[in-house]
Amino acid sequence: PYDTATNVGSMQKAITAEEAYLVFGLGPAAAMVSPWTDPAFVYGRPASKGTQISIGENIRVPAAKWKLQADADHQIDQSSTLAATIAALATDPNADKALGILGTEIYDKSTNRAKMHALAFRAFGQLRAYWPDRTSTTFDKQNVRDGHYPLWSYVQYLTPVGTNGKATKAGVQTILDALTGAPVTFTPAFDPIDD
């Protein structure tokens, strides 16, 4: 999953797809969606990153058409760097203006959750906004699993394969088999907890 996030000092709790469409599609200044009106405090990722691609699809703004400041300080390559950038605004009087996107796995680190908070997201056609988790303080991804939270995408794994079409590392092949439903034998054998 992916998050829209702001600084812990912000009073904002949620963002709608319509608001995100305007802020990222028109640009913060032109969108006039308070408090996200200052381009200096709105952060995204490069257009090639899955975070921006997935969120872009959900807000109907293609990743390459986001209106962000065209510099590395606002189109941040790594989610961890983006998290640090937003977290650094803790004592800034403009903390409420901060808005960024990042992977939930980065946001979920306790050091990041202490300095920023995820915004609940209300998708087009929804009546309520949801966090990826059941609440803003849990880590269960309940709303992703039950379909309420749409900001996520599939993950692809790449690995070298031999002429037999199997992964060249046995451990990797075991994981692939387990994920795809192929028969798997674990050594040592284990007893599944959900028989």
Spell out what each predicted region is.
Residues 1-195:
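Flexible loop/hinge segments at secondary-structure junctions
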